[in-house]
């Protein structure tokens, strides 16, 4: 036996071997099958030589898990997590451990995908429905979305909705009260500029002086003041103004709802419902509107429908509003949202129940009363006369107070005009109030918390005016009143989890979604308090660990992409598209070319591309694709020439959405550049580029990167995501800035695209760990293995299904498209039938009907083993045999295992099942693998039409759950 070297024994590549699914023997067998000698040989056969990198990445060597954890622990320790009283939309919260352990840290929840296949997603759909119910109850409005990205972007969406639905069609002014959070105003101004709206900022009561299509107010405002807007809202609505309100979710537990005051739209952050601050995110935003505006709502909405048996079933409702269908005509470009965080917030409400939430909110308000009473007793002047949790103070020696605060390791809010703000939260204790007295007043103030509390109890408090105290009940549905013990809560979460298929059960081969392993070691640091509990507006010298992590990650991404700079701020891929297009737009404006507003987009593009272009104020011109799925160069040349004087950019995905490396990609870039345009290369398929080629090397100017695809952040059932953009040097001055945090970059003066300066910074440690552990060679091998897995699946399935597009040497890139249209024509079996039948085999369906209707797009990723790939292939082969029985007439078109899929326990218990032309075993145990490890769909096929015609988006009677 040959002795191993010490380097081999140290196993620095162990994580790589665990991340990549096929072991060396499996890889060789697969290479032999596809006809390649090695991964390098296969790469040479697939990737055009003209765009292949000649040098390896300069990330460094791979490292072991323990080494990686030790390094990032050192970064975490550099963060100084002071007690935060900054507020401004971000607050300390206590994450219930039953939720932390069973949801946030549970792959059954965080590795699932957006519930496009609702029959195998009923658990998280119920949790999201609960989130919508919480949102509706607290805001007093009719219809809630399943989550938006953050409060500031929700404000921008509210402005867009207001313009769509306002009857004041000639108005072009959107009014923003001057006491909203500054980051919200920043994002709204950025979006308004793209739309050509005028934003007027002023005192709330001056809104009536303008001809408006919409207006935005903060409740409670940035200084803590609570205002009764009832009369103002009535006046504005009489003038056809759409009234939108940014509201604090915890305050709404005690306060009169904005809906009851007359608001049309209410939104805000659900962060303080059990989601850590995370240096800015991720957090779910709630968004609620009147029923009359339902068709103009942004984002996903969960609705109640029925399945084939007539039983209650949940699904995503009114999808025809969304980008994947309406493209540039969509209400918004929202794709990935914040479902995992919305679920956490909904479980927080379920666990505490209405009484628990009232206790928490009342405690926060009582501490604010005590703080205010003590300060006023000592002659301190307050800016606000009413409050829920925030006290704003004037007349203090700001420098002295700040010095004492820093010495006590606390952060207060310091405004430019000398106002000092203190925002309390769920984590506030008596000792914190005592410490605040010391910091604000200095020593020997003589104030006693207990005495002040007794005074308030005996005399009462007017911090919340009687007219603004909530009178109506909230969360009266039984779901919010029966799970207050941890035992019941744990079982409820588990019961919902068991209804959903996630990566911890089987491969999810969704094309263009890159459902790879989200390793436990990558997830671990996200829960650490040093990362989780930092306020995004903390002084940067307290966030040295975060800033170093962001700088290192940015440097790696620059190297991987071939760009010159990276902006981390966008908190989804679609937001990254928007941010990248804004950089292009501002670049043209800086050169006196503001008229360049046409965006060329191939007809095969992701739906977010045209939606984002529209969002950035661009006009979309669609270019054709040829029969091989490539961009039609002649059509591109013609259209680029036709619009040359106004050409802004092209948006193109690489490898293409058809799953091939287009040989002409550099020529495409050259054509656009020759006509004065910029090249936006969509990073959705970056998993086929890393280490082999790069957007910058190809010739692109800007790309977004889906960190929740290529770089291992989990999809969370529909979010969180991160969409940082890489840019060439000439675009770097035009990426997003931030009004609150300015780290000293040339782009600081630009408007923001997200509420927090670094977006959802709390999940960046995942991608940092992924890159650190894999190193240069590991990243490259991951890409090569993704190519191997895709070509293995393609070649195996090509014996049974037509493969629609192939590139050079008859290869595909990291995904393949099988064409079901001939089978549908011959048998009547649809792509939907096949997708639902895969549920019976224990699989989530591949991407349906994108980029070509009547097809399935399969992306296996590098993390799936040959064993799992073969299981999926066997399922598809078995389904093909089932289709043959329909073709031959053995099974009727309208009564067969595909048409009736998915099958549930209720099916096999049904005495009438015997009338079907196939057995119970064929229905639910169609393969040997399923017999030993069965996933049971809990509902039959859902009636989409019924759900949209009978729209109901709230919790249903408890009897329907039982």
From Swiss-Prot:
Record GO terms (molecular function): glycine binding; glycine dehydrogenase (decarboxylating) activity; pyridoxal phosphate binding
Source organism superkingdom: Bacteria
InterPro entries: GcvP, GDC-P_C, GDC-P_N, GDC_P, PyrdxlP-dep_Trfase, PyrdxlP-dep_Trfase_major, PyrdxlP-dep_Trfase_small
This protein's record includes keyword Oxidoreductase: yes
Cofactor(s) demanded: pyridoxal 5'-phosphate
EC numbers, comma separated: 1.4.4.2
Transmembrane segments: none
SUPFAM superfamilies for this protein: PLP-dependent transferases
Similarity comment: family membership: Belongs to the GcvP family.
HAMAP family: GcvP
NCBIfam families attached to this UniProt entry: gcvP (TIGR00461), PRK04366.1 (NF003346)
PANTHER family xref list: GLYCINE DEHYDROGENASE (DECARBOXYLATING) (PTHR11773:SF13), GLYCINE DEHYDROGENASE, DECARBOXYLATING (PTHR11773)
The protein's name: Glycine dehydrogenase (decarboxylating)
Organism ancestry: Bacteria, Pseudomonadati, Pseudomonadota, Gammaproteobacteria, Alteromonadales
Originating gene: gcvP
């Amino acid at each position: 036996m040959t002795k191993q070297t010490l380097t081999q024994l140290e196993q620095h590549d162990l994580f790589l071997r665990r991340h990549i699914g096929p072991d060396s023997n499996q890889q060789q067998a697969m290479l032999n099958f596809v006809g390649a000698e090695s991964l390098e040989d296969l790469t040479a056969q697939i990737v055009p030589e003209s765009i292949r990198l000649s040098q390896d990445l300069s990330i460094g060597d791979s490292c072991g898990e323990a080494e990686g954890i030790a390094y990032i622990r050192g970064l975490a320790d550099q963060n100084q997590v002071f007690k935060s009283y900054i507020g401004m939309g971000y607050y300390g919260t206590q994450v219930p451990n039953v939720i932390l352990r069973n949801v946030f840290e549970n792959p059954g929840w965080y590795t699932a995908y957006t519930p496009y296949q609702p029959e195998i997603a009923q658990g998280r759909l119920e949790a999201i429905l609960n989130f919508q119910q919480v949102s509706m109850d607290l805001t007093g409005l009719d219809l809630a979305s399943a989550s938006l990205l953050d409060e500031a972007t929700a404000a921008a969406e509210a402005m867009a909705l207001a313009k769509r639905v306002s009857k004041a069609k000639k108005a072009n002014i959107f009014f923003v009260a001057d006491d909203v959070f500054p980051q919200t105003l920043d994002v709204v101004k950025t979006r308004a500029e793209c739309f050509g709206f005028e934003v007027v900022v002023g005192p709330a009561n001056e809104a009536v002086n303008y001809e408006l299509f919409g207006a935005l107010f903060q409740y409670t405002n940035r200084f803590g003041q609570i205002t009764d807007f009832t009369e103002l809202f009535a006046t504005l609505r009489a003038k056809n103004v759409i009234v939108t309100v940014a509201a604090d979710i915890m305050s709404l537990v005690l306060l009169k709802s904005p809906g009851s005051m007359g608001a049309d739209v209410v939104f805000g952050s659900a962060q303080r419902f059990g989601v850590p601050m995370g240096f800015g995110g991720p957090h779910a935003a709630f968004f609620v509107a009147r029923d009359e505006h339902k068709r103009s709502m942004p984002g996903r909405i969960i609705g109640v429908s029925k399945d084939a048996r007539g039983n209650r079933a949940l699904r995503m409702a009114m999808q025809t509003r969304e980008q994947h269908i309406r493209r540039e005509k969509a209400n918004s470009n929202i794709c990935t949202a914040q479902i995992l965080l919305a679920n956490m917030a909904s479980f927080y409400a379920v666990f505490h129940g209405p009484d628990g939430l009232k206790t928490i909110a009342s405690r926060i308000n009582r501490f604010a009363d005590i703080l205010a009473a003590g300060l006023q007793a000592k002659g301190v002047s307050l800016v606000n006369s009413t409050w829920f949790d925030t006290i704003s103070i004037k007349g203090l020696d700001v420098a002295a107070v700040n010095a004492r605060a820093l010495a006590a390791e606390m952060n207060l809010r310091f405004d430019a005009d000398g106002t000092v703000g203190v925002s309390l939260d769920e984590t506030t204790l008596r000792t914190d109030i005592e410490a605040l007295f010391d910091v604000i007043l200095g020593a020997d103030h003589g104030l006693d918390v207990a005495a002040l509390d007794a005074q308030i109890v005996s005399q009462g408090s007017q911090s919340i005016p009687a007219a603004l105290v909530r009178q109506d009940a909230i969360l009266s549905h039984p779901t919010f009143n029966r799970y207050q013990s941890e035992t019941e809560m744990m079982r409820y979460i588990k019961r919902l989890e068991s209804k959903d298929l996630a990566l911890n059960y089987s491969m999810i081969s969704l094309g263009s979604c890159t459902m790879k392993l989200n390793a436990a070691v990558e997830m671990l640091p996200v829960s650490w308090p040093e990362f989780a509990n930092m306020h995004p507006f903390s002084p940067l010298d307290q966030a040295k660990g975060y800033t170093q992590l962001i700088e290192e990650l940015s440097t790696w991404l620059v190297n991987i992409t071939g760009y010159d700079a990276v902006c981390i701020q966008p908190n989804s891929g679609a937001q990254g598209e928007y941010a990248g297009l804004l950089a292009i737009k501002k670049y043209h404006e800086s050169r006196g070319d503001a008229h360049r507003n046409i965006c060329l987009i191939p007809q095969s593009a992701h739906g977010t591309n045209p939606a984002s272009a529209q969002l950035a104020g661009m006009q979309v011109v669609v270019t054709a694709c040829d029969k091989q799925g490539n961009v039609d160069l002649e059509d591109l040349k013609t259209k680029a020439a036709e619009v040359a004087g106004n050409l802004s950019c092209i948006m193109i995905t690489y490898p293409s959405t058809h799953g091939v490396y287009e040989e002409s990609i550099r020529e495409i870039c050259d054509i656009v550049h020759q006509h004065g345009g910029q090249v936006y290369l969509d990073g959705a398929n970056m998993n086929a580029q890393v280490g082999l080629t790069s957007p910058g090397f190809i010739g692109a100017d800007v790309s977004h990167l889906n960190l929740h695809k290529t770089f291992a952040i989990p999809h969370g059932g529909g979010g969180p995501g991160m969409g940082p953009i890489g840019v060439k040097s000439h675009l770097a001055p035009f990426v997003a800035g931030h009004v609150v945090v300015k780290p000293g970059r040339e782009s600081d003066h630009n408007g923001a695209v997200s509420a927090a300066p670094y977006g959802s910074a709390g999940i960046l440690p995942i991608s940092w760990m992924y890159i650190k552990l894999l190193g240069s060679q590991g990243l490259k091998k991951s890409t090569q293995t993704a190519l191997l897995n895709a070509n293995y699946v393609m070649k195996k399935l090509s014996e049974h299904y037509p493969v629609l597009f192939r590139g050079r040497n008859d290869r595909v890139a990291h995904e393949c498209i099988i064409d079901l249209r001939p089978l549908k024509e011959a048998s009547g079996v649809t792509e939907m039938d096949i997708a639902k039948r895969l549920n019976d085999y224990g699989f989530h369906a591949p991407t349906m009907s994108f980029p070509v209707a009547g097809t399935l797009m399969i992306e296996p990723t590098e993390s799936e083993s040959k064993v799992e790939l073969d299981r999926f292939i066997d399922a598809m082969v078995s389904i093909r045999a089932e289709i043959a029985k329909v073709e031959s007439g053995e099974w009727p078109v309208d009564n067969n295992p595909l048409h009736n899929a998915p099958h549930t326990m209720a099916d096999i218990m049904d005495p009438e099942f015997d009338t079907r032309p196939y057995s119970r075993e064929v229905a639910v145990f169609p393969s040997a693998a399923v017999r030993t490890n069965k996933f049971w769909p809990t509902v039959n096929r859902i009636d989409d039409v019924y759900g949209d015609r009978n729209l109901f988006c709230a919790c249903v009677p408890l009897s329907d759950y039982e």
